Amino acid sequence: MLVTLEEAKEWIRVDGDDDQTITMLIKAAELYIYKATGKTFTQANEDAKLLCLFLVADWYENRLLVGEKASEKIRTIVQSMILQLQYASGPQEERK
């Protein structure tokens, strides 16, 4: 896992018991990153970890898909980070 449940809850500032939803979002974010880059990353890769946290937070905050559009700023950051992970990442052990 790129991100633990506790890390994700702290990142999105959730005190309640939404563990099942957040765990599902973490798994979905990891799969999204894998499909976008074709690579599997470990927690040692800080860029991948941060991208996972961004995705989990965005999806959690916009999980109802009603109302405001998702932040365009977040979308731009996500696209940029995916490109960096896809083309600029070396072997996992080298990235700390």
Q: Which sequence ranges carry the predicted segments?
A:
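Divalent metal-cofactor coordination and adjacent catalytic microenvironments
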Residues: M1-K96
